[in-house]
Amino acid sequence: LRARLRALSVSLAAAIEPAAIDPAPSPARARMEAALATVGGDQPEVVAIYVLVPDDGAGRMHFAADWDRRAGEQVAPGTAYDAAGVPLLMAAVRGPQVEREVVADAWGPTLSGYAPVVDAAGRPVAILGVDIAASTIAAREREAIRRAAALFGVAALLLVAIGAVVGR
């Protein structure tokens, strides 16, 4: 999942034109919003994709764009976000980052990947984030445990059967 978050955030960030960050309607902004919606719609485990613009080095940011699968959770451009408690989000201005643990915020617990949106000179102008819900991660972990238990059970039965045959 972490590799997928990294790949999604990096590829989407690279596709965003710096002009799209401006909240005024423009073709670049329309392309960015369409890209977020298309990728989000095509990736069922993704719950949110957003673009944040750093306002200062202390973690204050604002939303430039937001796509959210959850009804009523989409955030309007210009809405403030305090990233001071999310160090990897703040570090994403220097390069792609993926959370190692689930982080909870006002929208719930998620695992997130971040990548910088850069201008023509390579300067970061925004950060693109991709979130996967913690419930998705928990479901995948439960499935992995179920599969491991099933394999262990099959292996144990085979060992018992082999032991019975060899013991005769």
What spans do the regions from the language model cover?
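Short N-terminal helix-loop-first-beta-strand/juxtamembrane motif that initiates sensory/input modules
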Residues: 38-62
